Amino acid sequence: MKMSLFGAAAVLFASTSAFAADVYQPEPAPFIDAPEVTVSEASGWYLRGDLGYSFNDLRGAEYFQGSNSNLVDFGSAKLKNGYTVGAGVGYQMNNYLRGDLTFDYMTKSDFRGSTNGECGAGPVACTSSDYSSLTAYTLMANAYVDLGTYGYFTPYVGGGLGGSYVKWKNLNNTACPDAGGACDDTVTHGGRGNWRFAYQLMAGASVDLTCNVKADVGYRFRHTLAGGMFGYAENGGPGRDKGFYSHEIHAGARYSFGGCDQPVYTPEPEPLVYK
């Protein structure tokens, strides 16, 4: 009887040990924290640069002839086209709104005009030929609406307010009799420079070149208001232009700071351990 009890106990112990071995669970592998990786987000700030060509339309010019009470229009007044170069800094507020401050320079644009009056000892009717040129520096605050992104393209419209510093060179005036004969000596009027109010309207599209570089191609209409043009000399002047329109085609690029997101590191799972 005792042997039977001992045998039963031995069998029970062996069964318990076997069951414990079957349900043994290994200790979990130690948790290894992945290295911290920061995802770069676009800050919104960007730099821009542009080159363009401006088709200029002078609205006319006028001057005082003989006295300060006799304001006369030029018979003709034309301003040639010029190249532009510009740069700026801006901020992208969201997917649709952005704004920037820009500074543009328009290269020398030649002026050709004519006036009608009297000249010579007679005096006789004369027509004067007038030659000058201008350059312009423009500072603008602009706002844009991006009209959605289609593939790599983002069309936009915008507008800006600011001022232009227009610098006229000396104006050379040569009067010649309408009936023919010797012309008067050329008279030089000192050029004027001044700040004027200006506004502009824009439309164009940007093209994604990389994650933080966009090409920008567009059209810009600018109206620069009237201002002083030249001073008094030899019983003529001063004179002023009536402002001018600029129709500009430009191309450039925008560089966004922090515009490239970094991929998030995901560690591979640890292999399962079986016993």
Model-derived features: positions:
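Sec-dependent signal peptide recognition
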Residues: 2-8
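N-terminal signal peptide c-region/cleavage motif recognized by signal peptidases
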Residues: 15-16
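Outer-membrane beta-barrel biogenesis signature
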Residues: 19-47, 60, 258-275
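Outer-membrane beta-barrel architecture
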Residues: 40-48, 82-86, 96-98, 136-140, ...
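Outer-membrane beta-barrel channels and translocator barrels
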Residues: 42, 94, 148-153, 208-210, ...
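Residues on the lipid-exposed face of transmembrane beta-strands in outer-membrane beta-barrel proteins
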Residues: 49-53, 87-91, 101-103, 141-145, ...
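Extracellular/periplasm-exposed beta-strand and loop segments of Gram-negative cell-envelope proteins
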Residues: 56-80, 104-138, 164-196, 224-248
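Predominantly the C-terminal beta-signal and adjacent terminal strand-loop region
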Residues: 108, 210-275
